[in-house]
Amino acid sequence: MKKILYLFLALASYGISAQTTAEEYLNSAVSKFYLNDMKGAIVDYTKAIKIDTNYIEAYRKRGLAKETLKDYSGAIVDYTKAIEIDPNCAPAYRDRGIAKGKLKDHSGVVEDYTRAIEIDPNYATAYFNRGVSKFYLGDMIGACKDARKAQALGDDASILIKKACN
């Protein structure tokens, strides 16, 4: 009877140690991403998410892999999920704004960057990117204000300033 108990405990502990964690899948996915294996990265990000359904970083990084494959709508779904988990994650709004920009949804870009700026008022990149979308929407005054604010925060917004502020 003791042998059976030891065997059971040994098998149970092997099963526990053999389980891959969400972080391990994330690390594997990041490696695949940098090796330009986007499909493999997406598979591993998905495995990380199955283990931890609130893993914001996995959603954001999977979105980036989808974006790299030009699956902008799929990327937006992942970024939106990250935002649902943490509505104050400014980088997730930035990520989603970039994907919306690739789909020429400049109004959506402005909304996302406005929210990112509400969360982090010193987010220079958000001001710059929002300014670019305002430029495409024909709002030169808004584009110029955002470009000047981005520049004041350290972003090189000189090209946008030349186009929007003259």
Listing of model-derived features with the role each one plays in the protein:
Residues K2-N166:
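Alpha-helical tetratricopeptide repeat
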